[in-house]
Amino acid sequence: MEKGFSVGWRIRTTAEFRRIYAARQRIIGRYYLLYYRENEIKHSRLGVVASKRNVRKAVWRNRVRRVVKETFRIRKKDLPAFDIVVVAKASSVEADNKELYECINKLFTQLERQSKRSSSV
């Protein structure tokens, strides 16, 4: 299993983020919003947004990002070929790591279900 979060797995440019937001497909969780869009490559890619406006302190922003990246790293082989942007809500500050992991896992599971549903139609 890969340990890092290399460039090939990341969404990097503003244009890519805008394209995903424009697709208007999202799943809402308690601590995160997950935006997604099918991509042309064979694997999923991730972008994480934890803005100063929602998550004030850098320590909190880094923790929120770290939880998302780690969960993605573990589950990326099971995820469908989507570009995924995870946006941290202000409520994520009050959650402990266990709650954050549970929330992001639930969102990734819902994404897998939706992709299976849309591919069978």
Curated annotation (Swiss-Prot):
GO cellular component terms attached to this protein's record: ribonuclease P complex
Top-level taxon: Bacteria
UniProt-listed SUPFAM superfamilies: Ribosomal protein S5 domain 2-like
One Pfam match: Ribonuclease_P
Keyword Nucleotide-binding tagged: no
GO MF annotation list: 3'-tRNA processing endoribonuclease activity; ribonuclease P activity; tRNA binding
Catalytic activities: Endonucleolytic cleavage of RNA, removing 5'-extranucleotides from tRNA precursor
Enzyme class: hydrolase
Gene Ontology biological process terms, A to Z: tRNA 5'-leader removal
PROSITE patterns per the UniProt record, alphabetical: RIBONUCLEASE_P
Annotated InterPro entries: Ribosomal_Su5_D2-typ_SF, Ribsml_uS5_D2-typ_fold_subgr, RNase_P, RNase_P_CS
Keyword vocabulary terms for this entry: Endonuclease, Hydrolase, Nuclease, RNA-binding, tRNA processing
Record-listed E.C. numbers: 3.1.26.5
PANTHER family, sorted: RIBONUCLEASE P PROTEIN COMPONENT (PTHR33992:SF1)
Functional summary from the UniProt entry: RNaseP catalyzes the removal of the 5'-leader sequence from pre-tRNA to produce the mature 5'-terminus. It can also cleave other RNA substrates such as 4.5S RNA. The protein component plays an auxiliary but essential role in vivo by binding to the 5'-leader sequence and broadening the substrate specificity of the ribozyme.
Subunit structure, interactors included: Consists of a catalytic RNA component (M1 or rnpB) and a protein subunit.
Record family assignment: Belongs to the RnpA family.
Name by which UniProt lists this protein: Ribonuclease P protein component
Upper lineage: Bacteria, Pseudomonadati, Pseudomonadota, Gammaproteobacteria, Legionellales
